[in-house]
């Protein structure tokens, strides 16, 4: 048996195991979510078709979150099977080292990482937007709570700070507009307020505008109508009104560069931007953490220990990544450190364990 045949066999087995675990975990989580929402879907008169649509539109969002865990379990399962059936010994007998065995799985892990990036960056945000639109359109009048106060929206627009009391569902009508203008040093230079605003072919037109210029003397001007020259599209307003959980890479980049308004702090979006790069690479780290299972520890009676070690370290990696990312989004840690430190640290741990076991 030549190495190309072994490589194809390894790749096929690895991909089948990972995809099986991915679909199993996603189906379980989606089933739990569906059990919670099934009564609401049926009360809206959507029937069985509504249940199917609910499941399919939310499934990509669930799958995107469990890819690293599926790679960890799939890698451990694949290597454990090879070790328990002495296939690892057979591979080593034809001259393949454990490093070459793991290297044969690397292209498949890279394909999974690329697919994970596409799903998180393109598929999940579109599914979330479609789900929100469908869920809002089918909402019953009895489900709407008129007594709930409408929360104003705060966001940064360049150096300025904007507050909008309410935004319409289509993002083309706003009420209660206030904008504090600031200079490059962050010092307030004026205040603009308007009763309402509407978006048309020429941009935003404000009504009942009052502009205050801070200085000596204080200047206050009023006008019935005024054009609001800002780069705020109706889609941007919709995102501000209902912030999406899944944000595509291009949108995050525009927010960080100041070309798209966001309701969170700059560190939050910078952390999310770094996570867009780092999250798909977690699959490679998971494969590395599973490597000790393939390193002949079965001969020492430590196969179960290596399996448990890979599982525990992988779960700790996921937990620490989530905690540090939350700290980065809150501004407690620099975004680069919050996102990349667990990835680099656990990749180093996995590599060190692999070298130690082989040595």
Regions found by a protein language model. Give the residues of each.
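Signature tryptophan residues that serve as conserved aromatic anchors
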Residues: 154, 204-205
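Transmembrane alpha-helices
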Residues: 1-158, 169, 217-220, 230-359
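Extended lipid/amphipathic-ligand handling interfaces
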Residues: 164-165, 194-198
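Short hydrophobic/aromatic-rich beta-strand segments that constitute the beta-sheet cores
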Residues: 163, 176-179, 205-208
């Amino acid at each position: 048996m030549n190495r190309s045949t072994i490589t194809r066999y390894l790749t096929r087995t690895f991909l089948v195991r990972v995809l099986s675990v991915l679909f199993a975990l996603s189906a379980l989580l989606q089933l739990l979510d569906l059990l919670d929402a099934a009564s609401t879907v049926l009360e809206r008169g959507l029937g069985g078709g509504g249940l199917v649509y609910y499941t399919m539109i939310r499934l990509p969002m669930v799958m995107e979150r469990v890819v690293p865990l599926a790679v960890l379990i799939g890698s451990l399962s694949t290597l454990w099977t090879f070790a328990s059936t002495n296939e690892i010994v057979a591979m080593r007998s034809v001259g393949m080292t454990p490093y070459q065995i793991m290297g044969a799985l690397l292209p498949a892990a890279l394909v999974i990482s690329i697919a994970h990036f596409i799903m998180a960056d393109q598929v999940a945000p579109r599914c979330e937007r479609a789900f929100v639109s469908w869920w809002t359109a089918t909402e019953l009048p009895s489900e709407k709570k008129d007594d709930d106060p409408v929360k104003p929206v705060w966001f940064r627009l360049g150096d300025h700070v904007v507050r909008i009391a309410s935004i319409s569902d289509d993002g083309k009508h706003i009420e209660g507009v206030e904008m504090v203008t600031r200079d490059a040093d962050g010092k307030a230079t004026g205040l603009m307020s308007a009763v309402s605003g509407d978006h048309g072919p020429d941009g935003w037109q404000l009504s009942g505008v009052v502009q205050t210029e801070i200085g000596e003397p204080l200047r206050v001007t009023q006008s019935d109508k005024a054009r609001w020259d800002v780069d705020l599209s109706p889609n941007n307003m919709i995102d501000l009104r209902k912030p999406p959980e899944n944000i595509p890479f291009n949108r995050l980049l525009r927010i960080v560069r100041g070309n798209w308004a966001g309701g969170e702090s700059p560190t939050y979006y910078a952390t999310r931007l770094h996570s867009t790069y780092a999250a798909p690479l977690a699959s490679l780290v998971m494969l590395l953490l599973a490597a000790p299972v393939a390193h002949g520890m079965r001969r020492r009676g430590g196969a179960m220990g290596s399996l448990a070690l890979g599982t525990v370290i992988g779960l700790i990696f996921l937990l620490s990544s989530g905690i540090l990312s939350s700290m980065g989004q809150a501004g407690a840690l620099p975004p680069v450190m919050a996102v990349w430190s667990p990835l680099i640290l656990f990749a180093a741990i996995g590599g060190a364990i692999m070298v130690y076991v082989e040595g």
